[in-house]
Amino acid sequence: MEPRLEQYLAEQQLTAQTQQVMPLTGDASDRQYFRVLLKNAKPIVLALHAGPIDFGSMPFVAVAKLLAAVPVPVPRILHHSDRLGVLGLEDLGDVTLQAHLGAATATEHAALYRQAVGFIALMQQRGEALRSDAYPPYRIAFDVEKLTWELEFFVKHYLQAYKGAALTDVQREALREEWSAIVEELASEPRVLCHRDYHSRNLMLHDDSLYIIDFQDARMGPDTYDLVSLLRDSYVDLSAQQVDGLIAYFLAHKSGDVPAEGEFRRRFDLMALQRNLKALGTFGYMTTSRNNTVYIQYIPRTLAHVRTNLAKYPRFERLLGLLEPWL
């Protein structure tokens, strides 16, 4: 067992109760996760960080408190050790929304997605009421700098590193012009509370409800952002009919002024283009820099989303021409 975990279990007086410690498949971060099976108690999950932590200043802790106040279901933080860099968390099991969909009936599938969309609407509505600079998400946003950085990440790690694209200075400048037009529009939209990575692998099915995980990077952004993450997911296929129905469901449950569906859909597609390009950058990075090839299987679906949106709008004719050799 990892020595820090052994020390942690001893400090929490769980050593005698511990039956087994099992590593879990992690995410694309530097954290490691372990399930601890306990005698006469529910299992727990330990999140092992790369080094010591400062519990009081961790975004994960603050955002967990914020989302619990919304309220939407998130894992409870049970205990922690700053010195050892460990968080003890409620164990939500292994069934992500992505994993469950293969066994779900059409009725279950629809109900789970409506629940997930309803959580987005609730986070946006209550997120405004709970707004406070005491919570990290209200101090950061999808601004021009962040959105541009993500698109440049796509250029570096997907186009150049993964696809081997040798871009000329003229092509690079043309891409920068296209990025500028996209991000200026997105960054100018009114901002709401966003999870930032709200997709089928970050929604867990536990006790007949969805629970939200991996929320530590929450920030302010367009009202389309989390909906795009869910409905233009790199990990799950949704039909056009399903997407249309869930967008309509979101608009029906959205608070405040409800935009016309056509205009909302245009903004949805623009946000999807930016986010899907960013996802390709992440997949390229994980493959070429981290030697993790598991994400290659999700590239074709993500490319399909990108191609669809580039072809749908005449404004992207030049961008489609620039990217087409590698799409």
Language-model segments: residues:
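Hydrophobic packing residues in well-ordered alpha-helices of helical domains and bundles
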Residues: 60, 109-116, 147, 172-175, ...
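Residue-level recognition of alpha-helical structural elements
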Residues: 56, 105-109, 168-171, 266, ...
